[in-house]
Amino acid sequence: MLENIQAYLSKQGVKYIKPEKAGLHQEEMEDLKALAQSARKEMQVLSKALEERLTPFKMDRVSNWANQAQICRPHFWCYYKAPEDSLDDVAMAIRLYGQPKDWGVSVEVSFIERKKSDTTLAKQHKVLDLPIAPSLYYFAQENGVSHRVEGTEDNRQMLKEAVRDKVLVKYDVPVTTSETIEELVEKLADGFDKLKPYYEKANKN
């Protein structure tokens, strides 16, 4: 299951060069592009299957397999928004994490960077108004650097008092080779249920 995603995770940071310009590496680059496109397709299938479990949420597009500098970005993400959400509201998302031998999909309460407004960060910070539930954790960004923060009451208070660029609430779902897409979707849907109160709190006026 999701074999192409798993294989593509090892390509984090690899520079893609158009095959016709890659000289001796032409075949290698053709293989890389084929793998990247197959991995993204798997992520699209997973995201769509999850969307069907998350009515009325609608998925946004899955992130590209490389950035503008043509550096491979295998940790795909996909945002989900409810019909009544405005462009700059806080959203829910899934995002890949890890390396081929130890990887998974995290569910998070986050926002789309390119659509944020002056009020988006203030909305996002409201996730700290609710006590943190078991199995959830924070992902705090400070001066552009993000790091994991254990989900404890002490840390919640610490994050509330300190000004952070961005604080996400996240839930990790490790992926095993033996499980099916349907089983993974159920676990991710459960993650959405766990995080929904934080999403609702963030968007409440």
What are these regions (language model features)?
Residues 41, 68-78, 139-150:
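Short charge-dense sequence patches
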